[in-house]
């Protein structure tokens, strides 16, 4: 028997014996997220990412990779290949649901499965100064949260709320937010429940457009957020993402 290791190891809720896509349906129902709202968010993600690519806003965070070819010169990959700036709400509306025949999650409003890698270097400020490293942001605080496994897509909400409360902050005290767009339904729920304005949320697109390479998305989201902060000269940002099993993490960073 052939087993898809991506689904078996990374995309299956072993507690409820369901695909992670079904948890996108769960969060859409719990927070009354419409299919139209999900498609609108997904189209926005594609368009924001396409703009960021065209304007070179991703360049500082990307490392070009040479890919050997069997019978030709190596190919240089220096941009995420899944971004589709011509995506519209109308084109997304034509796609059928994937995980539930009566559901709302489609291939267009879910994150794409991508190969990718990301890394960050975390260091003591004194060591960074000694080594001559540029400090791009300071970690202020971080939190974790846990909910029922089938509600995993909602787990970032208590993580962010705890982080704000612990720091004595209101939502609008933070300049930029970055949420891993595992499903558009999840991002819509997080922004809606926390009251995050659209012009502070996932400014350069997210996993719906850029992809969700499992294990790399945490670092990728953090750096993409810092890139957006650099572009608009924002001073503070919160990045958050859910984890299999019903957990989530959130981190507050600050630029000087």
Protein language model features and the residues they cover:
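Internal helix-turn-beta structural module
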Residues: 171, 188-193, 197-202, 207-250
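Cysteine-centered functional microenvironments
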Residues: 27-34, 39-41, 102-112, 143, ...
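Active-site pocket-lining segment
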Residues: 22-25, 61, 69-71, 140-209
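N-terminal extracellular/periplasmic Venus flytrap/periplasmic-binding protein-like
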Residues: 37-130, 193, 198-200
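Short acidic, glycine/serine/threonine-rich loops at helix termini
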Residues: 77, 150-152, 213-214, 248-253
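Active-site-proximal alpha-helical scaffold in enzymes
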Residues: 28-57, 119-126, 213-234, 252-253
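Flexible glycine-/small-residue-enriched beta->alpha junction loops
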Residues: 1-26, 31
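Condensing-enzyme catalytic core mediating Claisen C-C bond formation in acyl metabolism
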Residues: 2, 7, 29, 87-154, ...
